[in-house]
Amino acid sequence: MAIERITDNKFELVSKYDPAGDQGQAISELVENIENGEKAQILRGATGTGKTYTMSQVIAQTGKPTLVMAHNKTLAGQLYSEFKEFFPNNAVEYFVSYYDYYQPEAYVPSSDTYIEKDSSVNDEIDKLRHSATSSLLERNDVIVVASVSCIYGLGSPKEYQDSVVSLRPGQEISRDQLLNDLVGIQFERNDIDFQRGCFRVRGDVVEVFPASRDEHAFRVEFFGDEIDRIREIEVLTGQVLGEVDHLAIFPATHFMTNDDRMEESIAKIEAELEAQLKVFRSEGKLLEAQRLEQRTNYDIEMLREMGYCNGVENYSRHMDGREEGEPPYTLLDFFPDDFMIMIDESHMTMGQVKGMYNGDRARKEMLCNYGFRLPSALDNRPLKREEFESHVHQIVYVSATPGDYEMEQTDTIVEQIIRPTGLLDPVVEVRPMMGQIDDLVGEIHKRAEKNERVFVTTLTKKMSEDLTAYFKEMGIKVKYMHSDIKTLERTEIIRDLRLGVFDVLVGINLLREGIDVPEVSLVAILDADKEGFLRNERGLIQTIGRAARNSEGHVILYSDMAKALDENDPADKEILDSGYYTEYEGKKYKITRSMKHAMDETARRRDIQMAYNEEHGITPQTIKKEIRDLIAITKKTDSGELEEVDASAMNKKERKALVKKLEKEMQQAAAALDFEGAAQLRDMVLELRAMD
């Protein structure tokens, strides 16, 4: 039975802050553009300017159901936590891949190796996915924070909605009919272990535990063949929380198919099997034909008997009634037509959207060519980028450095440059590559005397190693951050840098998560004129931003300055006319297009920030950020106060008990989607284990 979506709920933003800096202007521009029907726009916001708050204000003021996409689970979890705080009275949902572990089905012809699909589903995330889809069909005030997994097939929203079991007090329906209806939407009867997606029966009382809940269930009480009343109960204690006048029970799976559709689907699968067997046999692929026939007939038998089979998603084209090549249903189809999409870190996320389809296709083609799957399995896939675009009603790309794709989609760019702390983008200068190491040594000594830190980025592993060795010979306290270093070690290195155990961190890629250090006042980029992934415009801007947390922030780009530009040389004059040059000691030298654009953009932002600070009497202050010792572990005393525990003073048995306790807390934090807290607890556990 279909249900009506409640459309009169409003978003209610709860925050103790008012828009600061240029947030107010950015918010009003974005809202005005949306209300004027602008399809795509970019929020180009510098790091640390409060882009999530701006996004929240835009959602609240436009009132549109919104999909917020991020490029990984960790970032999605952080955004989800922030939006939950901003909108405690609205439906803020979380939709990411529910696999803790996932090994996709694959075949490697070179070694004749078939790898069966193997996975482990996270029950908590599965619950949140069900909560997201049910909220989207029930109400309008919904924000769904999702990873790119939201463009993967999910089942038909119409079948899902039409399968809803709708109950009201006074409704005429027999108890047995309700039980049949619940089984029909994939609920299981379990009178002993009552959990999500189950129901239990006690005389004239049926208790239902929805797939989207984790603590509360519903008790349906019958009087003959009529529902007497419906109560919400706490699962653990059985305590009645209140009565409800309507209960919509959504299916326990997103992949719903009624009996008639199932028979149609099986007939189509059989027809496709017959056609594909003819193709294989005509090509002399008898092994492939036998394999396909055996596997598919087994799946058909399972579908007939159980309504389900292993890898049922590979038959989704037939189950959904789609034509060959048609896009699958995804989370996007559950939204109303006028919904809004916000893409966080769009320069990363849109690249993922583009790449998902091709990677999936290559793996599935191998399975189909060798008789492991029917060709229709190719239509169990993520959306292509063009198909994703066809779902877009209105979209906001959010990034400090928008990608080429976003820039091609729209000319409407809204900027957010002012940081509430008053911090400026750093001063950037270019210096010659000749003598760069000695020059850098001098700069490092200046920073060390002021108790400040330095980042040095190189292009190759060998150069990083050689540079680190040279600095050590010169008496500089230095460490090298390379790709083999694990997360925990990286955290330790950053902590030691902040504490002043060493002054200089050398690395190739210093753009990873968690490497924002307020004590860093100098970033030196060696070989800045060598175009590539970390020396393109976006890479340079992001690396330059590492010095933007310190009021003394300074960046030096070391570049080849072997030959000054000569205005009388036609080739040099062309470079001078293009503007891709810099001045050093009265002479002009060629620089790359990326360097020029990164420097110009940083200078432009800095000028705007300085003017704002001057007008409002703001003095930039370096961010004060607590330095947490990994070994410092706190526990609650009997009085409820926190006290620090010295792990090194514990014996082995005490540490083992503490590890057990922390692991439990880590799992609780992960279940509550506090991924940062869970990661900190994990690091503590690893540290404690390393001590024994």
Curated annotation (Swiss-Prot):
Task: State the organism named in the record.
Answer: Lactococcus lactis subsp. cremoris (strain MG1363)
Record's function text? The UvrABC repair system catalyzes the recognition and processing of DNA lesions. A damage recognition complex composed of 2 UvrA and 2 UvrB subunits scans DNA for abnormalities. Upon binding of the UvrA(2)B(2) complex to a putative damaged site, the DNA wraps around one UvrB monomer. DNA wrap is dependent on ATP binding by UvrB and probably causes local melting of the DNA helix, facilitating insertion of UvrB beta-hairpin between the DNA strands. Then UvrB probes one DNA strand for the presence of a lesion.
Q: What is known of its domains?
A: The beta-hairpin motif is involved in DNA binding.
Domain UVR: from-to ranges: 656-691
- Name this protein carries in UniProt: UvrABC system protein B
Q: Does this UniProt record's set of keywords contain DNA-binding?
A: no
Annotated GO biological processes are:
nucleotide-excision repair; SOS response
Give an example GO cellular component term for this record: excinuclease repair complex
Tell me the compartments it is located in: Cytoplasm
Higher taxonomy:
Bacteria, Bacillati, Bacillota, Bacilli, Lactobacillales
Residue limits of the Helicase ATP-binding domain? 32-187
Q: Which gene encodes it?
A: uvrB
Q: Where is this motif: Beta-hairpin?
A: 98-121
Q: Which UniProt keywords apply?
A: ATP-binding, Cytoplasm, DNA damage, DNA excision, DNA repair, Excision nuclease, Helicase, Hydrolase, Nucleotide-binding, SOS response
